[in-house]
Amino acid sequence: MTDFRQDFLKFSLAQNVLKFGEFTTKAGRRSPYFFNAGLFNDGASTLQLAKFYAQSIIESGIRFDMLFGPAYKGIILAAATAMMLAEKGVNVPFAYNRKEAKDRGEGGVLVGAPLKGRVLIIDDVISAGTSVRESIKLIEAEGATPAGVAIALDRMEKGTGKLSAVQEVEKQYGLPVAPIASLNDLFILLQNNPEFGQFLEPVRTYRRQYGVE
C-alpha cells in the first residue's frame, strides 16, 4: 500500500502547486518551498485533489455529518470532496458561504444544505486562522457543531507565539485538524528522493528556525 501523503506531495510537485527554491512568505520569512493550492485549477487536478481529501478525512476518523467550505477556495473543495466521499460510500451534504449576503432569491450568506449536526470545515491551508474562526461562528450561529478542519498542507510553522496556526485552532476550539500532508511528510519526501537532495538542508534549517513539534 502506498503512502497517500507522499503521493499527494509528488502530485503537488507535478502540478507546480508545490515548488522548491527561494520564496518570501506573507509573514516576510524566506522559505525554501512554496505551496499554492490555487494551481489545482482544472478538472483532472481538482478530481485527484478531492480523492486525497476524501482519503485523508476518512483515515482521520473524525465524526461528521456534512462538509462546509468557506468562500472562496473552500467552495469547490467542499463540492468535489463530497462527490469523492460519496464514491467511497460516505454520502454527506455540503454547504458554503458567500462573502456578501444576498438580498433576493434564497438570500443570506449560506448556500447548499442546511448546517446541521457535526460540520467538518474544509479549506486549503490554515494561515492566520481567520477563515476557520469565521466558519465556526457561522456554524454555531445555525445551531450546528464544528467537528474539525480538513486542510491540504500543514506547514507546521510558528505564528507570532510558540504555536502554529493549526495548533492555535486545535487549542482554542478543541477541534482536530486533519491535513493531507505536513512539513514532516515533505521532509520525508526530500530524504527519500535524491533528485530533491539540494533542498533537504534548506528545509531542515527552515524547520529548525520556524517549525513546531
Curated annotation (Swiss-Prot):
Orotate binds at F34, F35, S127, R155. Homodimer. InterPro entries: OPRT, Or_phspho_trans_dom, PRibTrfase_dom, PRTase-like. Its cofactor is Mg(2+). GO terms for cellular component: cytoplasm. Pathway: Pyrimidine metabolism; UMP biosynthesis via de novo pathway; UMP from orotate: step 1/2. This is Orotate phosphoribosyltransferase. It catalyses: orotidine 5'-phosphate + diphosphate = orotate + 5-phospho-alpha-D-ribose 1-diphosphate. Keywords: Glycosyltransferase, Magnesium, Pyrimidine biosynthesis, Transferase. NCBIfam families: pyrE. Coiled coil: none annotated. It comes from Neisseria gonorrhoeae (strain ATCC 700825 / FA 1090). The lineage of its organism: Bacteria, Pseudomonadati, Pseudomonadota, Betaproteobacteria, Neisseriales. Its EC number is 2.4.2.10. Belongs to the purine/pyrimidine phosphoribosyltransferase family. PyrE subfamily. 5-phospho-alpha-D-ribose 1-diphosphate binds at residues 26, 72-73, 98-99, 102, 123-131. Disulfide bonds: none annotated. GO terms for molecular function: magnesium ion binding; orotate phosphoribosyltransferase activity. It holds the Pfam family Pribosyltran. Catalyzes the transfer of a ribosyl phosphate group from 5-phosphoribose 1-diphosphate to orotate, leading to the formation of orotidine monophosphate (OMP).
